[in-house]
Amino acid sequence: MGPAIVRIGRGPSTRYGLAAPIGDLGHAWPLYLIDPRGAPREIGVLHSLAGPAWWLEMAPGAAWQSLTATDFPDAIFPGLPWFLDDLRPQGFLGRSFARRHAARLGVDSDPTNWSERAVAESLLKFGGDLPGAFVVGAESLAAALQPTEESIPADLRPEVYPRLATEALAGGLPRSSAGGEQPKFTAIVAKSDGPESVIVKFSPPLETPEGRRWADLLAAEAIAAEILRTAGFATAPTEWIDAGGRRFLEVARFDRTRNGGRTPFVSLLTHDAAFFGEMNTPWSDAAERLRSKGWLEAMDADRLVALWRFGRLIANTDMHYGNAALLLNDRPPLRLAPLYDMLPMAYRPGLENTIPALSEEMLARAQSAASPERNLALSFWQAVTESRHVSDSFRSIAEAHEKSLRQRP
């Protein structure tokens, strides 16, 4: 028996494609969106086609125009649909996810070597707790609706987090896949106002030079988030804890709600790759593209520009498109997601764990800045200078940056 024929569309625009089954999982699966209350809604059926290509057959009444927009009016995608691309295993947690499931998928343990079909199979079999709110297939939905892991009492974090860090470094945590290379794990913490889903970054041992520097940077990340939050920017709430000889930075997840719900989002990287293909340009350029094409309202576009300017003034050399995100609506405009990963990455330890000294290049950047975010950056460096939680060497760096910003005419 040959491959099944898939009818695409209706009326004069009807087209036909060949189904492309994935293993014994078939070629069509429901696509669910879990809402902020934790209730799933089927928004369509995802078809795997020969080519390869993918077709999203929208459910009646599920008018998610933002998923197809002008570039994909027939909801046919040349690869895995762009709004699912952030579900690929990536970063520190993604590699851990891949190591756990590679044998059952029959693929290499390095997810960068996975084919698109392997990625799709992982979404269908193990996609119950991935970033965002989309879930593909009934098997992963059943996993998504299982009772969540037991919450960690807030007062027990100093005891539990060091153990989870050890397990994460060993690749033994069966938790959510999220991007980024900084060692981390995910958890649910029982806070006074309810359970909170968090991503927890952690430093190497504080007794090492690289551990001390990463501890400085994690403190700086929390300070930057607070400075920006006070100025009216949406940032993910943070809290740091020193325990077990490490520093832990707890960052609230904006894609999870307190009552077990989820919020759909895509990284700026994924969105730009799908609609513009200019991912190597600054955030400020992305903001203008998003504004001009109606993907962001002017206020959010201006905020993205402001965050980019602020990042340059605090020596953040890692503002790639994976470090900004957009909250999905059923139709444009989208919304800028709360900020995360804003810290002075110019001062992170090098590949050989060398510890960077004061960067004259970063100081010169501050000297030439005329942006309104200069005062925010000044507040940031002043707060770092005054913090009791940074090392003397990093305090000296902060003092130099503060002085440089104050001296600018």
Feature names for model-found ranges:
Residues 2-409:
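Phosphate/dinucleotide-binding and metal-coordinating scaffold of catalytic cores
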